[in-house]
Amino acid sequence: MGAGAAATAIAAPAIAQSSPALKWRLTASWPKSLDTLFGACETFSKFVSEATDGKFQIQTFAAGEIVPGLQVLDAVQNGTVEMGHSAQYYYIGKDPTWALFCAVPFGLNTRQQNAWFQAADGQKLIDEFAATYNTKCLLMGNTGCQMGGWFNKEIKEPGDFRGLKMRIGGWAGKTLGKLGLVAQQIAGGDIYPALEKGTIDAAEWVGPYDDEKLGFYKVAKYYYYPGWWEGGTTNHLIINLPKWNELPKSYQAIVQAAAGYANVEETAAYDARNPGALKRLVANGTQLRPFSQSVMEACLKASNEVNAETSATNPAYKKVLESMEAFKNDEYLWWQVAEYSFDSFMIRARARG
């Protein structure tokens, strides 16, 4: 055997070993009908397959096909599936620190979230925290600033929240609880029937595109803005940590690249689809309403109280919150000079025609 042939024979098993054939499962918190959220999962799995010449296959499952939508973290943590796609504020019952990595009232917007994770402390902090749950988390989508929810009565002042039963995700329910609202955590696909039957009085989900798909305009009249509890909602790819550590470095790099691509695509899709959906909702009779200044101020006060109370008893929460708040404060120095002043002028110019 010649030297070249011998080298090829030796190298072939090594290449095969570094690029093994794998079949993983990914369970999502979303129904397939929400094609932007679930679409991020499909984009991710397709990217991984194509980048590995089909050797690394990831099958995607919608909420309820393997586990309910709110049990994705459990399924990944205990190894029922290798991966999941979810919003971490669903898991505040385990530890409210999870919400800080997703969306909290008066927190970071979309670009600030991406910057905090990718160019500041965010990824390091979530690596430390998620490891205690046997998981690894990567950015994989952001909805942008969300809407403030669907109501069958007007919310003119803070007292109008009192006694309302509202489907609202994450830490916002804790905040509005201080104003007398009764928060309900319900998966996206179950919100419409709950509104229709009167099990809940109000609901928030994402924004115009997804809310239109779920039909909320048929069972609620008033659509409020902004969703101050979700200025930029980060969804994450959640990976079983031992499985992640077993992956070849090349596959880890591909997974990170695929998640990053899906992260950008999800935000772009929402930005492109929401304007048309908002127009259609209004044409169908939806009445847009802004939250009043008094409502916003009362909610900010309640949010600050929740953060102070939680930080006093939860060191992990305090550590992550302090990092996020310091980053946000510096960011808004810059945004006030550049982004905000530019966008404000352009919005006024548009109104003038």
Q: Where do the protein language model's features map onto the residues?
A:
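N-terminal secretory/targeting leader peptides
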Residues: 2-8, 13-113, 121-353
